[in-house]
């Protein structure tokens, strides 16, 4: 899909490391943010292989602090090419952070958002730069979402993202009861048997996730403590829709661009983001912003 962010953004990321060298030391906050993002991305270019805790497998470590484990089949569970999956996820992580952090800090094509979001960019950079454990791990058909983020509850626990390579490849889960395949998915008994014992079923209507950098940034945003809701501003969804060309589920670029622009407009609403939590919840309802998520879901089919 094409949204107004995708054109030329790869070139923007390549230039980001160069731009920081051209900004004077006395530049304003924008220069500091450019430098912070570029510094983080530069650190994450440094990779090394280390054994996992059990010692039976290798993990790819980025910047000495972010571990990628069990991702040889990333992005799809039936693709296995040695180290290729690890390196692909590392690239998606860097790309997603570059695009997402630039966007929410007001340095991207959307222009300035409310300062609330620049503070979130700073918080995420600080989190990714600290020494707390951070793990991106891949699983197969073990979640009912494309990916799940687990924020650390205390300093002794790691921040973790589980990416279901089975789910994002668009395959029907094998974790349901036979009656569910028969009654809900309307599969015949022979097809149920083939699905459970052979190659899994892939329907045209099942979504194959495409914007993987956006998915990774979406999950990392959960590490800031945000959860999904429609009772108040869903920060995670707003960031993904505004910063990554709309919803990954909508093939119509024109419709998607409209949703993207609406999300960015919400992120610029000073009245909403200046408010305390209780007032923001009321404004979210009064301004009709809650309708955005519902309309995106309807447009996704």
Predicted regions, residues:
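Walker B catalytic acidic pair
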Residues: 219
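N-terminal secretory signal peptides that target proteins for export/translocation
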Residues: 1-7
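Bacterial N-terminal signal peptides
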Residues: 10-21
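Predominantly extracellular/secreted Zn2+-dependent metalloproteases
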Residues: 26-213, 223-301
């Amino acid at each position: 899909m094409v949204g107004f962010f995708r054109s030329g953004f790869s070139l923007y990321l390549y230039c980001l490391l160069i731009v920081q060298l051209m900004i004077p030391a006395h530049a304003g906050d924008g220069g500091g943010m450019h430098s912070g993002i570029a510094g983080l991305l530069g650190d994450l270019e440094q990779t090394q292989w280390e054994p996992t805790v059990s010692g039976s497998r290798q993990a790819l470590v980025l910047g000495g602090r972010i571990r990628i484990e069990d991702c040889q089949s990333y992005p799809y569970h039936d693709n296995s090419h040695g180290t290729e999956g690890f390196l692909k996820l590392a690239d998606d992580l860097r790309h997603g952070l570059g695009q997402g952090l630039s966007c929410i800090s007001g340095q991207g094509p959307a222009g300035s958002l409310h300062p609330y979001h620049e503070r979130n960019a700073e918080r995420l950079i600080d989190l990714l730069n600290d020494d707390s454990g951070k793990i991106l791990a891949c699983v197969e058909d073990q979640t009912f979402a494309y990916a799940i983020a687990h924020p650390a509850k205390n300093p002794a626990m790691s921040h973790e993202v589980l990416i279901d390579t089975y789910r994002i490849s668009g395959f029907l889960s094998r974790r349901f009861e036979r009656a569910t395949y028969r009654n809900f998915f309307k599969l015949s008994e022979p097809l149920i048997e083939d699905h459970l014992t052979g190659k899994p079923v892939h329907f045209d209507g099942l979504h194959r996730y495409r914007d993987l950098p956006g998915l990774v940034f979406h999950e990392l945003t959960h590490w800031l403590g945000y959860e999904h809701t429609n009772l108040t501003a869903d920060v995670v969804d707003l960031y993904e829709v505004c910063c990554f060309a709309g919803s990954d589920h909508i093939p119509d670029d024109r419709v998607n661009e409209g949703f993207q622009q609406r999300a960015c407009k919400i992120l610029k609403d000073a009245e909403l983001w200046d408010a305390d939590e209780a007032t923001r919840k009321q404004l979210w309802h009064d301004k009709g912003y809650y309708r955005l998520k519902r309309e995106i879901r309807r447009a996704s089919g």
